[in-house]
Regions:
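All-alpha RGS (Regulator of G-protein Signaling) helical domain and cognate RGS-like helical scaffolds
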Residues: 1-181
Length: 181
């Protein structure tokens, strides 16, 4: 698990692959532990506290902020209707991450803040994941779409030759966002 996480962290060209494989490995470990009745620690939610800058261009940070904002809004709607595993805490964490990312970007805040949830409300339990074509819990698809958007933004940032306003992370804190690690 940590090898894939390290690949994502230290090899920009393999960020997407490392991130997804790390998540898959963590999921496999959880499934195996559950089947073997092994108690493993629950993942901790991470935050953006203490992060002063990121080595990602302005446009990518703004795109990541928009993805976090959109899933935060959807989770808020789902929590209000008691759908899936959505909670107001999850919604708040996404929205806080969104705000932090847009602040770090220095870009004009063009987030919509409210989004069309008609399709989500029509399919509150399961929905087709457009990336895989498979039915999955709607809240899980929302999280995966957010993660895919962020991975694409970072991948675009790492391959962009004219990336604007890049700076190094100045925090010693390893927190990166509001989703489970």
């Amino acid at each position: 698990v940590s090898d894939w996480a390290n690949t994502a962290a230290y090899c920009p060209a393999r960020f997407a692959d490392g991130t997804l494989r790390s998540a898959q490995a963590r999921h496999a470990v959880r499934l195996m532990a559950s089947r073997l009745a092994i108690d493993i620690a629950q993942p901790t939610l991470s935050r953006c506290d203490g992060i002063d800058s990121l080595d990602v261009d302005t446009d990518s940070l703004a795109a990541m902020a928009a993805a976090e904002d959109q899933v935060g809004f959807a989770m808020e709607v789902f929590a209000a209707r008691s759908f899936g595993h959505a909670t107001l805490d999850i919604s708040d964490r996404h929205k806080t991450t969104s705000q932090r990312l847009i602040s770090l970007s220095g870009a004009e805040d063009n987030r919509a803040k409210t989004y069309d949830v008609t399709q989500l409300l029509a399919n509150p339990n399961t929905i087709v994941d457009s990336a895989t074509g498979l039915y999955a819990p709607t809240d899980a698809v929302l999280e995966m779409n957010c993660a895919r958007s962020e991975i694409a933004a970072v991948a675009a940032s790492s391959t962009s030759s004219n990336a604007s306003t890049k700076s190094q992370t100045t925090s010693d804190d390893h927190s990166d966002d509001s989703r489970e690690q």
